[in-house]
């Protein structure tokens, strides 16, 4: 591992490149003091000048309460530090035994004089992309704050081809679309009624998409926008300004619409951009793993990959059901007596069916069998805002946990 000395630089604009020179990241402040970055790959612009910052909520839980102000502009560069890092580490499991973590870093320490608040924006630039995050040191003027929205922009250089699914706080069960960026709005509008009729989907914007977002440019660059090290912070979606082709972060809110209750010191997740002229690098690049926090589990001997089959896909395709009976319009945990109900004949998680899967797993070298729909409550579990849906311990009458567990172990299956 090598770490170079930190070099303080009192400048408002600074450039850092990847160790191999392919990726260039430039930071600057606008005339209004708003943080801005841009990015290029092998001399081709990947991200046009894009704004950075956070809007904070006027909230009684914040240190400044209803007098809260934003972290969007009015900044001055207090210090800039650069460094190089190079190490090789071993993941618990993965495609490779070792992973090289090699990057050049630039940390821009900002101060907002009107509020006397400090914020650092840290950039790490790799061979195939970069990551950026916001860092908030503990300080009297920024001890507790509530996020209204994070405004991290990704300004695209053209009407790229996008591989995307609609933005949704709860599910990813959509069909992937392949359209130009300007086609996202049209597809969501066309399918909005079908989205409304599916109680598992809730599209939050006319141009919102989920990460990771895969893009391809007209001149053959592959770009992926995602995040890493998402801890104690909402997950990030992207909302597109399709007139200007600018994506902006859109955080998942809580029940009252707030998007983060922060106690400093605190670091946000990394916002990542992968880029290459070879599509295979989107999968082989280890940038996300390198930016994730190191594993904190001391004994990892119990963690291992496995192969399994399961009783669930036949419910998805409609040949079996999760529910045990069709007799009742609704059920109540602890009150409904399933032994008095007539089986519907399509229940998937039965003793007979699960034994069939166990036999298949044992014969074909699969280590485990996954079973859904074995416990009481599946008759009206979805789409009703029901409080008590499952108790997760009481099986249906046609599912014997003890006997099936013993049978599986006798076959060497879990």
Residue ranges, per PLM feature:
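Substrate-binding cleft of carbohydrate-active enzyme catalytic domains
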Residues: 308, 321-414
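Bacterial Sec-dependent N-terminal signal peptides
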Residues: 1-15
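N-terminal accessory beta-strand-rich subdomains and adjacent acidic, glycine-rich linkers
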Residues: 15-298
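Boundary/entry segment of secreted carbohydrate-active catalytic domains
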Residues: 305-312
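Conserved mixed alpha/beta catalytic, RNA-binding, or beta-rich assembly cores of soluble enzyme
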Residues: 282-285, 294-300, 313-324
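Catalytic cores of large soluble enzymes that bind and process phosphate-bearing ligands
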Residues: 100, 122, 264, 301, ...
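Solvent-exposed loop/turn segments at secondary-structure junctions
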Residues: 134, 278-280, 315-318, 375-378
């Amino acid at each position: 591992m090598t770490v170079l000395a930190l070099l303080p630089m009192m400048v408002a604009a600074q450039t850092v490149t990847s160790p191999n020179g392919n990726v260039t990241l430039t930071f600057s402040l606008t005339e209004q003091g708003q943080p801005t970055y841009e990015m290029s790959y092998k001399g081709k612009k990947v991200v046009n000048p894009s704004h950075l910052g956070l809007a904070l909520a006027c909230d009684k839980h914040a240190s400044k309460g209803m007098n809260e102000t934003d972290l969007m502009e009015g900044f001055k560069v207090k210090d800039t530090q650069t460094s190089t890092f190079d190490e090789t580490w071993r993941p618990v499991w993965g495609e490779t035994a070792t992973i090289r973590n090699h990057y050049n870093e630039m940390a821009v320490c900002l101060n907002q004089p009107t509020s006397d608040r400090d914020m650092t924006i840290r950039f790490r630039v790799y061979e195939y992309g970069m990551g950026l995050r916001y860092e908030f040191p503990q300080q009297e003027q920024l001890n507790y704050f509530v996020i209204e929205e994070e405004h991290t922009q990704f300004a695209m250089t053209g009407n790229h081809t996008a591989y995307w699914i609609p933005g949704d706080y709860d599910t990813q069960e959509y069909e992937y679309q392949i359209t130009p960026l300007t086609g996202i709005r049209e597809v969501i509008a066309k399918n909005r009624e079908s989205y409304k009729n599916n109680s598992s989907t809730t599209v939050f914007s006319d141009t919102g998409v989920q990460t990771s977002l895969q893009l391809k440019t007209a001149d053959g660059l592959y770009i992926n926008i995602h995040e890493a090290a998402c801890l104690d912070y909402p997950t990030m979606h992207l909302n597109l300004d399709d007139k200007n082709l600018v994506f902006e972060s859109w955080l998942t809110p809580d029940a009252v619409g707030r998007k983060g209750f922060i106690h400093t010191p605190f670091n946000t997740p990394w916002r990542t951009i992968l880029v290459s002229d070879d599509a295979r690098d989107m999968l082989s690049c280890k940038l996300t793993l390198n930016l994730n926090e190191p594993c904190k589990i001391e004994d990892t001997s119990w963690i291992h990959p496995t192969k399994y089959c399961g009783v669930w896909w036949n419910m998805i395709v409609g040949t079996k059901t999760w529910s045990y009976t069709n007799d009742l319009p609704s059920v109540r945990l602890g009150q409904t007596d399933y032994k008095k109900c007539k089986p519907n004949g399509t229940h998937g998680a039965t003793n007979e069916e699960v034994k069939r899967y166990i036999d298949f797993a044992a014969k074909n070298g699969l280590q485990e069998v996954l079973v859904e729909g074995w416990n009481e409550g599946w008759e009206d579990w979805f789409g009703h805002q029901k409080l008590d849906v499952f108790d997760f311990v009481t099986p249906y009458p046609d599912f014997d946990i003890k006997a099936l567990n013993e049978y599986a172990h006798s076959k060497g299956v879990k």
